[in-house]
Structure formats: C-alpha cells, structure tokens
From Swiss-Prot:
GO annotation (BP), single: cobalamin transport
Organism taxonomic ancestry: Bacteria, Pseudomonadati, Pseudomonadota, Gammaproteobacteria, Vibrionales
Disulfide bonds: C183-C263
UniProt keyword annotations, A-Z: Disulfide bond, Periplasm, Signal, Transport
Protein name, entry field: Vitamin B12-binding protein
NCBIfam families per the UniProt record, alphabetical: PRK03379.1, TroA_like
GO molecular function ontology, one term from the record: cobalamin binding
Organism of origin: Vibrio vulnificus (strain YJ016)
Length: 273
C-alpha cells in the first residue's frame, strides 16, 4: 500500500490550496451535516459511512469509518477540500493527506458556539455563502432563545450512558457534556481522567445520579438497571430517559433539538419537586 501511496504522491504533489472548491469530502457524520448547512451539499462527492443525514448524504461514496480513512480512494477522487474531525479521524492518516497537499478543514466542535462558527467558516466555500451565513445566524438565534427559556433550571446530577458492554460515559468538557450543562446538568463523572471512561454499576450506584440518560443503541439489555431501582435515585423516581443519539452525539444544528429534549426532562424533575 505504501508503494501505491508513494506513486500517487508523485502524481498529486502539487498543492491544491489555490484551486477553487468544487469537490468536497467529509470524514465525519457531523461534518457532513454542517457542510450541508453551510451550502456545500452540491459539492460533496464522498462522506463517512455513518453520514446518513440529510437523506442525500446516503447516496454519496463512502471513504471512511470508525476503523480509519481510505487514503487511496480519497486520492483518486481528487477533492479540493476535506472536512476532517481531529477528535475522531486518525491523526497519522490526516497527516498523510496533508503531505499530499490536500486542503483540510478541521471541524473543531467542542462547544455549542463552535457549531455556528463552523457553518459560517465553511460558507465561504459555497457558491452562495449567504446560505451558510443565514443558517449560522438562525442557529445562534435559536440557541439564545433556548438559553432564555431554560436558564433558570436548577442543578441536577446526571449520568449519561453511551454503551452497556462495557458501560461507557462522558467526562470533562467532552461532547456532549455542554448540552447537559446548558440545561443545568452536573455530570456525576465529570472529574474522571479519561474523556470517555469505562465505569461499573457499583460506581454509578455510589454517585447517586438524580437523572439517567441513554442512547437507544446503548442498551442491549433493557433490564440491566432493574435490580438497582432502590439504590439509584434516578431509577427510583423514574428519571430514566432515552435520547435521540443523532441529535445529541453529533454537534450540528440538530443539537438544538437535543438541548430542548434534555432541558424538558430536567424541567420535569423540577416540576415534581
């Protein structure tokens, strides 16, 4: 493979940065959604395997997945711009793409603000930048409206479960922590050293969360928490909810839907107090 890549490098070593942006590849589902919001949908030629929104993205060629990036395919497609996800795409493979001279936009989406910024920044590559500028503006306006609506929610200790075997959660500033924090949530595993730590049922019991959230695909065993109803306040008080994982786990304009979903659940707890 290295010999093939070396040959291709000789063919495409000229920098592409000066070329007009007509062919775009996205290496992450959230970057694909943001590209469409920025007005780049007509320029997308390939995306990641899990890029399933909007519907048009499903028809595009697939060049990456959780295992890595198909470098040879990307090189033969000759993109003018690659949308990469530094937190999810292999750094070494991104470095190789840089060495080939490809223009790469790194989608940094660690905060709610970053979503609007990404849309606005990518709009410059659209034939009609106003599409992205309008969508970025609408996103920010809606975000501020939600902030005004839910800013007085009390603090609620929560646990968010990403998977069940093993049990994985989120810690620190890692996505989607800010969505929960926006709604007054306090992560019971906020201080964990790993960004997405593996935890045990016993640890969750000791943390005594007031609310528990899962993604639909996270629970293969629907009864895994049943024996602990009396031990965990969230379960005892029926504060256990499934969330739309695409809305929540992908930092895109649809995150606004996740915010409303989470905030409404926290608000329902307050109504019972």
């Amino acid at each position: 493979m290295m010999k093939t890549l070396s040959s291709l490098l000789l063919l495409f070593s000229v920098s592409l940065q000066a070329a007009p942006i007509e062919r775009v590849i996205s290496l992450a589902p959230h970057a694909t959604e943001i590209a469409y919001a920025a007005g780049l949908g007509d320029k997308l030629i390939a995306v990641s395997e899990m890029s399933d929104y909007p519907e048009a993205a499903k028809k595009l060629e697939k060049v990456s997945n959780y295992k890595g990036i198909n470098l040879e395919k990307i090189i033969t497609l000759k993109p003018d711009l690659i949308l990469a996800w530094p937190a999810g795409n292999p750094a070494k493979e991104l470095e190789k793409l840089e060495q080939f001279g490809f223009k790469i936009y790194y989608s940094q989406t660690k905060s709610l603000k970053d979503i609007g910024d990404n849309i606005e920044q990518l709009s410059q590559y659209s034939d009609d930048p106003q599409i992205g500028l309008n969508n970025a503006r609408d996103y920010r306006t809606h975000l501020e409206a939600l902030r005004a609506k839910y800013q007085n929610l009390p603090k609620t200790r929560y646990f968010y479960q990403l998977s069940d075997t093993p049990i994985i959660t989120v810690a620190g500033q890692n996505w989607p922590t800010e969505v929960f924090r926006f709604c007054g949530g306090e992560n019971v595993f906020d201080g964990a050293s790993a960004p997405y730590p593996q935890v045990s049922i016993e640890q969750v019991i000791l943390k005594r969360p007031q609310a528990m959230f899962v993604s639909p695909h996270a629970i293969q065993n629907n009864g895994m928490w049943s024996p602990w109803v009396e031990e965990i306040p969230a379960l005892k008080n029926a504060h256990f909810w499934q969330l739309n994982s695409d809305w929540l786990n992908r930092p895109t304009p649809r995150t606004l839907l996740a915010i409303e979903q989470v905030c409404e659940h926290f608000a329902s707890i307050e109504q019972k107090r």
